Amino acid sequence: MHLQASVEDYDSFARSLTIGAETMVMKFRPELPMHDRYEVAYDFLPPSAGLEVLAISKLINAFFRWEFNSCESLVVGDEVHPIDYANACPDIAITSLHYYFPWAISALLKWSTFCAVTGRTPRLDTNTRDYFDVADSDRSYGDKLAEYARLADAYFEKDRYQEFCATSLASLDEIVLDWVASPDFDALLVDTVKSTYPAHEQDHFVAHFRGLLSLWVHDNSG
C-alpha cells in the first residue's frame, strides 16, 4: 500500500496505451460512463507535457519489460503527475476505445508479427543499472527524460520495428482501414453491442459507435 498526494483541478487526464514500440496518448474522463471516457481529442496537451507523458509511458514499459500496458497521468499546465502506471492487461474493448480501437488492433498485429518474424524475444535481465545511472546523474530532468526515452526506444528496437512495418507491412494500414469500413466490421460492432447492452439501449449505442468509427475512417482516409 502507498499514499499519493491528490492533484486538484487538473487540466487533463492522459491515459496512454503502449503496445510494443508504439504509444497512443488519449484524453480520458474517468467520471463518465465507460463508453464516453475516451474523448476524441487532438493535441490536447501542451507540447512539452505531451513529450513527457510519451517518455514516461515508454520508460515504464522498458524498465519492467512490459509490452502491453497503459499509464495514467494528470496534467496541470505543463506539469505531468503520473498516478497509475501498472495496467498490464488494459481494456481495449471496442465499446471502450471506439475511435482508438482500430489503432490498438493494428499495433497489436504489427508488434506480434514483428516479434514472430524477426525472432525478437523479451529480455529477462532488466538492466536496471542503466536506468539508475541516469536517475543518479547530475543531468536536468529534461535531459534525463530524453535519455530514458532513448533507452526505451533501444530496448523496443524502435528503428528496426519502424523499418519492418514500412517494408514488410507497408499495406497493413490500408487493409485495416478497409476492414473497419467493411460490412464484416459493422457486423462485429453490432454483435458486440448486442452482447454488452440491454435491448432498449442497443440502437442508441450502435449509432454512437458507428459515428465514432466512421470518424476514424474519415480521419485516416486519403
Model-derived features: positions:
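Short, well-ordered beta-to-alpha junction loops that form the rim of enzyme active sites
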Residues: S6, S73, Y85
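A short glycine-rich, hydrophobically flanked beta-strand micro-motif that places a catalytic Asp/Glu
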Residues: A14, W66-D78
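Conserved short hydrophobic interaction patches
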Residues: I60-F63, W111
